[in-house]
């Protein structure tokens, strides 16, 4: 439940809990422990492992809730714009085929910065989990066929787990130094599977029914207080990581994920000791209930949250998401899963006989299936948002090409002394740049951050092509370490040049963007050659341009948003021209 809590906090309140994504690693560690411990117990009891039975149990636990989630979510997609169902057929195929992680890598997905988030991107973790179940179950079964000593069997599993853990972790550690998009590491079945094997190592040292002599000794030697304090300490350390880690920081991949997994093993071990120390204690019913529905809540919460945040405030969206997720995950665990497995159905202490209602159940499932099929058929391959960005990119390229031809022909005055280095917001404003600032050189791209922009900035300085005024419009993708990032532009700016910084805006992250904006205003006070184009101020004054948007890219139903954006930059350019350039004194 700790893992689910951190994931929910991260998704619902990412600014306050930036490292909550480690909740998935807690899931992975616990799954590795639980599956391995159960397999060892089965071998200890029966001297063999029923591989097909293992796969069957995993299938009934994982697949029905997943399919139910997809079927239930599809009708809700008609409440939001079609961008959210673009290529939905491919997303569904990846989800039910347990290849979402590969799908996101191939399509260039970024876990944190998708402007139109995929509704089923969260099933990437389910894909890696299924890969682990398939391979690990087969390997442990194979080992059980060739060993008849439980102690040696445990020892061998520990050794192999340790080797797999080391290989997977080293893969993440080394790749962290060489990739530009860390999501390719995060989504990787190879690089991100080490928590499972760390959990498996703990399973060989503890077990569930069949435990080790060392573990039994610790149960006797540890006080109950020590067990509880160890659990509390491990939870506190995980919470500390939740506040300290950032998704795109290298240290997260070098040490963050492995520390989260290690702290999770501490919690698992202490919980197992405490469980055996208090055999007659009963867990509160609410704890058992949350443990039962946690998988379902994980499945349902993300698509519901994405949809509801487009319809209401974040706080209300969180409340509605939690309610809907609990309702459907409860029905899934207590009704659907046992019904499909041929077991008795029991809900709220009542035995339910669903056989008289089979036609209604199958009819409802068929109807939802038809809705899903129709949605797949009518959904666009590419959403309007991506299409508009593509069109703007082509327009930008053509405009820059025309300017190059003009300069080559000898008319040097055709190219102004203003260059805009921008992100997708600037790219979305290409048409307005052409009409309001036709002489400005615009270089904009999707998901561009300060690091990308600084590379362009340095290249222009080195090649002697830097315009007299550079407009830096990339802040919304660079909300971490912004002070250092901005300072490098100021320090590198040559004498005789001016810098304009466009303040960022994100309706879903106002607190952090305001913090960045306030700091950027201080830079204009400190350096007379730095001017601020206050897009944040213009954006907050015009809420009408944000209706039905992602909160970062204004509505393109008309040119209002684009014109406001470019006019803010235009105003700053005019103001900057009246101020001295770097190295010049005030007149």
Q: Residues of each region from the PLM?
A:
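Hydrophobic membrane-embedded alpha-helices
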Residues: 2-123, 128-297, 302-338, 342-346, ...
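Structural alpha-beta junctions
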Residues: 492-500, 522-531
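Short, conserved loop/helix-junction motifs that constitute active-site signature segments
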Residues: 462-465, 490-496
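A general structural detector for well-ordered alpha-helical segments in enzyme core domains, enriched
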Residues: 485-489, 516-520
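Structural recognition of the beta-strand scaffold that forms the well-ordered cores
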Residues: 28, 97, 419-420, 440-444, ...
């Amino acid at each position: 439940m700790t893992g689910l809590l951190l994931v929910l906090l991260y998704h619902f309140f990412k600014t306050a809990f930036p490292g909550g994504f480690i909740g998935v690693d807690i899931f992975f560690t616990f799954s590795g422990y639980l599956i391995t411990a159960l397999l060892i117990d089965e071998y200890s009891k029966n001297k063999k492992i029923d591989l097909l039975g293992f796969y069957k149990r995993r299938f009934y636990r994982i697949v029905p809730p997943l399919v139910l989630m997809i079927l239930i979510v599809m009708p809700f997609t008609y409440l939001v714009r079609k961008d959210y169902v673009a290529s939905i057929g491919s997303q569904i195929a990846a989800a039910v085929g347990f290849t979402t992680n590969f799908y996101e890598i191939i399509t260039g997905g970024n876990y944190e910065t998708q402007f139109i988030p995929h509704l089923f991107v969260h099933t990437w973790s389910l894909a890696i989990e299924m890969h682990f179940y398939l391979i690990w179950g087969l390997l442990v079964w194979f080992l059980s066929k060739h060993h008849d000593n439980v102690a040696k069997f445990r020892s061998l599993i520990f050794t192999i787990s340790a080797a797999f853990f080391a290989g997977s972790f080293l893969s993440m550690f080394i790749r962290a130094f060489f990739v530009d998009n860390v999501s390719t590491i995060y989504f990787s079945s190879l690089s991100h599977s080490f928590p499972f094997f760390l959990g498996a190592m703990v399973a060989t040292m503890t077990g569930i029914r069949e435990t080790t002599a060392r573990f039994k000794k610790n149960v006797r030697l540890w006080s109950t207080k020590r067990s509880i304090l160890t659990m509390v300490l491990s939870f506190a350390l995980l919470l500390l990581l939740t506040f300290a880690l950032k998704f795109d920081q290298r240290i997260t991949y070098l040490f963050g994920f492995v520390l989260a997994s290690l702290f999770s093993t501490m919690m698992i071990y202490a919980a197992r000791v405490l469980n055996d120390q208090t055999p007659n204690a009963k867990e509160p019913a609410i704890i058992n209930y949350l443990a039962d529905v946690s998988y379902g809540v994980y499945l349902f919460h993300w698509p519901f949250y994405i949809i509801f945040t487009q319809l209401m405030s974040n706080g209300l969206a969180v409340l509605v998401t939690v309610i809907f997720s609990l309702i459907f995950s409860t029905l899934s665990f207590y009704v659907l899963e046992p019904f499909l497995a041929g077991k008795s159905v029991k809900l709220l202490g009542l035995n339910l006989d669903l056989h008289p209602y089979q036609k209604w159940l199958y009819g409802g499932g068929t109807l939802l299936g038809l809705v899903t099929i129709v949605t797949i058929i009518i959904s666009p391959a590419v959403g309007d948002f991506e299409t508009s960005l593509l069109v703007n990119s082509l327009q930008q390229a053509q405009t820059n090409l025309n300017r190059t031809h003009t300069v080559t022909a000898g008319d040097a005055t055709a190219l102004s002394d203003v260059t805009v280095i921008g992100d997708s917001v600037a790219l979305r404003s290409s048409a307005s740049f052409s009409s309001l600032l036709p002489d400005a050189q615009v270089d904009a791209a999707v998901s561009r951050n300060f690091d990308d922009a600084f590379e362009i900035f340095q290249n222009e300085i080195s090649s002697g092509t830097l315009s007299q005024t550079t407009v830096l419009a990339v802040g919304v993708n660079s909300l971490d370490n912004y002070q250092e990032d901005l300072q490098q532009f100021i320090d590198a700016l040559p004498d005789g040049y001016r810098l304009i910084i466009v303040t960022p805006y994100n309706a879903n992250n106002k607190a952090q963007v305001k913090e960045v904006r306030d700091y950027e205003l201080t830079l204009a006070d400190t350096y007379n050659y730095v001017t601020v184009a206050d897009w944040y101020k213009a954006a907050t004054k015009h809420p009408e341009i944000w209706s039905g948007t992602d909160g970062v890219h204004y509505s393109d139903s008309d040119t209002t948003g684009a014109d406001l954006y470019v006019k803010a930059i235009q105003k700053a350019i005019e103001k900057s021209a009246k101020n001295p350039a770097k190295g010049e004194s005030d007149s």
